[in-house]
A protein has these predicted regions:
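Class I S-adenosyl-L-methionine-dependent methyltransferase catalytic core
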Residues: 1-293
């Protein structure tokens, strides 16, 4: 039994919706994923999944943009069989043979076995390699040997927590960005205090590294509080940080994020308000600071 249980929750909707479209637009030659988890999962109809992928699929029926999205098409087909496609499967299906290779990192061997099994059962799949190790150091070590046409999907929970060698996933983003590679980094937080501390840390690190051209999108539950956790649908707020992407991709990220806010306007998670609001850490964008007591 693989221990990863966050599949199909609301943050996955934002992350995977954007990932599929970005990969289709950018068409990388090499795909690298830092925290892969599994390629495919059996759905269990938890309240968190109902608030996540089930709500999205139901509401997307009324939105032509989402109906035409790769994420909707791939998940709608898979969910008919009771399965959710994780990011490794989505990446393989979107990229197909148009990519030279996909590199998947995870600390859990069972997750990597799941990815390899999924790839073997596909009629068309790109060449893949799996790495059962700490992906922070593993990817940092690989970066100099990877082409500029590489795309990194950096998907931890804590992006600024150092590993045993003092390296963080933010270091991975900065290193890859400086090599000219395209990056999509996901992060999460549970309180407004956590968000503000993370935003400050990320902004300062990027500024220090000389990285000023980046896109950011955050979706946050209106139920979030300043310093207390009132509920746990998987995560109360999450963000996507993108570097070296085309303007088309950057615009899509903002557009899709705001459309998600609209389809979640009447959502509920258990007895809590499940509606979302949009924010960003990028001071060049229109920042909305919201008060939560």
């Amino acid at each position: 039994m693989v221990t990863y249980t966050h599949f199909g929750k609301q943050p996955d909707v934002l992350k995977h919706l954007v990932l599929c479209e970005v990969l289709q637009i950018e068409k990388p030659q090499i795909y690298v994923e830092t925290n892969s988890a599994c390629a495919i999962y059996t759905m269990t109809h938890t309240p968190e999944q109902k608030y996540g992928i089930y709500h999205f699929l139901n509401e997307a029926n009324e939105d032509a943009t989402f109906q035409n999205s790769l994420y909707y098409q791939l998940e709608n087909e898979s969910m008919a069989s009771g399965n959710y496609l994780g990011s490794p499967a989505l990446a393989m299906k979107v990229l197909n043979n148009d990519v030279k290779g996909c590199l998947f990192f995870d600390l859990e061997k069972r997750a990597l076995d799941n990815i390899e099994s999924f790839a073997r059962h596909q009629a068309v799949a790109p060449p893949i390699r799996t790495f059962n190790c700490d992906s922070t150091d593993g990817v940092l070590k690989l970066l100099p040997s990877l082409p500029k046409s590489t795309f990194l999907h950096i998907d931890p929970y804590e992006i600024d927590k150092p590993n045993s060698n003092g390296h963080t996933y933010l270091d991975v983003l900065i290193g890859a960005t400086k090599f000219g590679m395209k990056c999509l980094l996901w992060y999460g937080f549970m309180t407004i205090n956590d968000k503000q501390a993370l935003n400050k840390s990320v902004s300062e690190r990027l500024d220090k590294a000389g990285i000023k051209d980046y896109a950011c999108s955050e979706l946050i539950m209106n139920a979030i509080k300043k310093d207390t956790i009132v509920c746990n649908p998987g995560i109360l707020g999450s963000g996507i940080l993108a570097t070296n992407l085309s303007q088309k991709s950057n615009s899509m990220i903002q557009d899709y994020s705001k459309k998600l806010v609209r389809i979640y306007k009447d959502a509920r998670y258990k007895e809590f308000d499940g509606s979302l609001y949009y924010d960003t850490i990028n001071k060049k964008q229109n920042i909305k600071i919201k008060r939560h007591l």
